[in-house]
Amino acid sequence: MRPRAAHEPGKRHASHNYSDALSGLCRQVSATVKLSGTLLNENSMAFATPITPAIGAEIQGLDLRRHLDATTKAWVAEQLVQHKVIFFRDQQISAQQHLEFARQFGQLETHPVNPKDGFPELLVLHNDSDRPPADTAIWHSDVTWRPQPSLGSILIARKVPEVGGDTLFANMEAAYTGLDDSIKAQIDGCNAIHRFEPMRGYLLESGADAEQLAKFEKKYPDVTHPIVRTHPVTGRKSIYVNALFTVGIEGMTDAQAQPLLDKLFATATRPEYQCRFQWRESSIAFWDNRAAQHYATADYYPHERLMERATIEGDTPV
């Protein structure tokens, strides 16, 4: 064990440096996220309660079985952009109502794997003793291997294990703000390469053969997106690479790109940028895929976990 250095007069102790760094981090997070809960209007009783200073809010007072009026829809969209992920509890909605809620925020994607019978726009995520969680439990943004990745995803819990199976979310705008200026300068204007490859496992599980795999890989060749994405609503910058789908940086060799990517990937793992959601049946998470990453813990195996996700089409990252 390395001996602890004695405190020298006239020099600041390391703990003071850590404290200063943490205070600076908190200021960066606070500059990105507004901390107060928000009442929708005096007639509705709907309000948002932040989960952490960095990301996440729980919305109470809304019944998602009902169509949202224009004011309420705009308010929900505002909470999504502000908090990056919003949560709803005890929403007893059917698959059709799930889709109707999601369609209020845009056109829906049809995911290439595991659609729900009769509802091709719903992705089924079902794990139990016979279907262990996939090895894609890695920090990521959804479908960045598409030219126009998702705007957002709306995930509902249908069956949950007694304990475990939480999902973590990270604010990638705060992560960008926390970067050293030298790294910001290094990645400014750079594009990263994103690849469909990790989805092969899901396709194989769903029964795809070699010919079908080849068709998917032809349909989804590698794409490039800016490493620093500008949010189309707020204009804020965020880190837009992820450890699951990003495989390189345009114009760099692997040896040059990987150390930089590893630094950027690691920002999502900082607890100061995160919140953690404990699922209950009929809970919903709605996240902004343009500014947040997520990580589904696989600690519940062999117990059952059944989730369904609607995904909203996005635009081309800039």
What name fits each language-model region?
Residues 8, 14-17, 21, 31:
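Short hydrophobic alpha-helical segments enriched in small aliphatic residues
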